A protein has these predicted regions:
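N-terminal helix-turn-helix DNA-binding core of bacterial DNA-binding proteins
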Residues: 11-44
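Basic amphipathic alpha-helical segments that dock to polyanions
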Residues: 38, 49-59
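Short, charged/polar surface micro-motifs in flexible loops or helix N-caps
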Residues: 31, 55-59, 84-86, 103
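Short, cationic-aromatic polyanion-contact patches
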Residues: 6-19, 34, 65-90
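Amphipathic alpha-helical dimerization/coiled-coil segments
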Residues: 84-116
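Short, structured protein-protein interaction patches enriched in aromatics and acidic/basic residues
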Residues: 45, 57-59, 69
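Linker/hinge segments immediately adjacent to helix-turn-helix/homeobox DNA-binding domains
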Residues: 1-5
């Protein structure tokens, strides 16, 4: 699908230009991951990971796929990338971004919500 909004285009270009954000997006494209999993896989400092994940969620590039509760009663979120692939094309003065949605995480969340 062709993306038209300037806000989402700017967010995607910013995320792809930041190597740490790319290291967060890559493992969450195919499987939901917790912040701890992302930190372990990317060997990124905790504060950096939390800050970048918050930014990605605020920009709608990452969604909370699930909220889990441990046996001790602690909550943690599993994150999933909104896009499966992104193609950026710059021609003359126009930036065109095509993105393939990630198996529509919004529909999955809606289905889970109504199945409760």
């Amino acid at each position: 699908m062709q993306l038209e909004g300037q806000k989402i285009k700017k967010a995607i270009l910013t995320a792809l230009a930041d190597p740490e954000m790319v290291r967060i997006i890559n493992p969450t494209m195919y499987q939901s991951k917790s912040v701890c999993d992302i930190i372990m896989e990317s060997k990124m400092p905790h504060t950096t990971a939390y800050r970048k994940i918050k930014w990605l969620v605020d920009q709608d590039l990452l969604v909370i796929d699930r909220i889990c509760i441990t046996d001790e009663g602690k909550k943690y979120s599993l994150f999933l990338s909104v896009f499966r692939s992104i193609v950026v094309k710059y021609e003359n003065i126009k930036i065109m971004i095509e993105a393939e949605q990630n198996i529509d995480p919004v529909n999955r969340l809606t289905e889970r919500f109504f199945s409760l």
